[in-house]
């Protein structure tokens, strides 16, 4: 899955290794894997409960479907900060629909990051064969 770029953001694909580090609460490992600084409050239990609808074993059994389109939002400036994530709730179904969601850390809200990340993610999804509708 490619990295997506916007004017201010780099959207880095979520991998099983990132999921495992988040679930373990291993901030240093997450930072190393995504090559960016995480907020002090990240990862935390609330993030884990919001972000992962499936358990790690389900993700490992079908990572392509479970992590389809999921990316971490990282600022492209010199600070390289994780400001949130944009995720799809799985790969497209037979009906051609996918559902997108996002989360932005509190200190980075109201700066347009979610709009920017969601736009490029929706464009990416709609460019895939079999995707006809993106719901939010």
Give the predicted meaning of each segment.
Residues 1-99, 104-107, 120-124, 128, ...:
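GNAT-family acyltransferases
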Residues 110-115:
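Glycine-rich acyl-CoA binding loop
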